[in-house]
From Swiss-Prot:
It catalyses: 1D-myo-inositol hexakisphosphate + H2O = 1D-myo-inositol 1,2,4,5,6-pentakisphosphate + phosphate; 1D-myo-inositol 1,2,4,5,6-pentakisphosphate + H2O = 1D-myo-inositol 1,2,5,6-tetrakisphosphate + phosphate; 1D-myo-inositol 1,2,5,6-tetrakisphosphate + H2O = 1D-myo-inositol 1,2,6-trisphosphate + phosphate; 1D-myo-inositol 1,2,6-trisphosphate + H2O = 1D-myo-inositol 1,2-bisphosphate + phosphate. This is Phytase A. The keyword Secreted applies. Catalyzes the phosphate monoester hydrolysis of phytic acid (myo-inositol hexakisphosphate), which results in the stepwise formation of myo-inositol pentakis-, tetrakis-, tris-, bis-, and monophosphates, as well as the liberation of inorganic phosphate. Myo-inositol 2-monophosphate is the end product. Keywords: Disulfide bond, Glycoprotein, Hydrolase, Secreted, Signal. 1D-myo-inositol hexakisphosphate binds at Q49, Y50, R80, H81, R84, T87, R164, K300, H360, D361. GO terms for molecular function: 3-phytase activity; acid phosphatase activity. It is found in: Secreted. Glycans are attached at N104, N119, N206, N219, N338, N351, N375. InterPro entries: Acid_Pase_AS (IPR033379), His_Pase_clade-2 (IPR000560), His_PPase_superfam (IPR029033), Histidine_acid_Pase_euk (IPR016274). Residues 1-19 form the signal peptide. Pfam families: His_Phos_2. The active site is at H81.
Amino acid sequence: MAVLSVLLPITFLLSSVTGTPVTSPRQQSCNTVDEGYQCFSGVSHLWGQYSPYFSVDDESSLSEDVPDHCQVTFAQVLSRHGARYPTKSKSEKYAKLIKAVQHNATSFSGKYAFLKSYNYSLGADDLTPFGENQLVDSGIKFYQRYEELAKNVVPFIRASGSDRVIASGEKFIEGFQKAKLGDSKSKRGQPAPIVNVVITETEGFNNTLDHSLCTAFENSTTGDDAEDKFTAVFTPSIVERLEKDLPGTTLSSKEVVYLMDMCSFDTIALTRDGSRLSPFCALFTQEEWAQYDYLQSVSKYYGYGGGNPLGPAQGIGFANELIARLTKSPVKDHTTTNTTLDSNPATFPLNATLYADFSHDNTMTSVFFALGLYNTTEPLSQTSVQSTEETNGYSSARTVPFGARAYVEMMQCTDEKEPLVRVLVNDRVIPLQGCDADEYGRCKRDDFVEGLSFVTSGGNWGECFA
């Protein structure tokens, strides 16, 4: 586990970012099962996909509660893995950058003092202990939300084949089972859930939880180009300030972003509960964090979402699997589904009522856009920051943070013959598109499926190999 060689007082760190003192999270409950990570929210909710999960239920006028006259009959969670160390390639770049700063800077004063003796010791790729705890909490929350179903059944669980994703599924199970065993009304004698299916991430293998098949998409630079464009907009003034404050250093725009990345990665590695904020965070202003957060949204939107012509197509396979589960009918798909797995009841049952799938932020972004959840989001500006109000709720921090979870629930109500479907992303009800959503954001199941014509037709998947 990574160890930070210098820890600054929490109140100093946040006051450097926001200008106001902050109560130590050790004195308050700021990381909970229900609300997720609310510690240092003035900055931690601005880390894009590197933010730990936080509930955004209050960002919708629609209640996330199940109406009293309705009963949930089906629930599916699609989850991102928990907080992790940087990827191996990024970890090497971060270490190299910090070493260069330490070698070249002739002065380390004020908020930069910690850099002089900072020891880079972050791991790579795997979950941090904090990330493991996130998924335990996620399992507890899933059980509690769908208790009437969960107390009597065992969920069917799949994971994409990277170690951190599999481990996330296992930690989710730990939390789910902990909640179930603590429920006096739960059915006794049932086996504990297991990760029933692990889908390999070997290149060329069909996997609805991890993209890799679409040649044209994998070769696309649309996301990188958009990211570079906005990076060039907001980083020059930061480069100028940092080079002045750290005399002797020469930094690129990309390296500024790397230093900002360290704020999140260092924080989630310091403690199991996220109660210490990394001193890297104080190196940047509140406005700069808003710009950084928007950069991550631009990157995801143009890399894997609606801003990439083939982005939503990468989510078609999972969306067709979801339709099969909702309708209890065989999967109909010719994109990323694995026919061998999906035609076998042992590896793709259609009679379950609880499902959990574990994936990555990129593929989840594609799934959300394949389902049309953010069809009302206009193309993101690549030159100026847009608020989440302007993007109709879309941002990478609010959709695919570490430990993100989307719930697809089907309910039977006394005033409706047909079951109703709705989707919540990190607790925010997303009014369904392509069908006549009611005041709860729900659509009749058949109308929901009919509205997914992009998915059921295979969309523009054929362009992958043109």
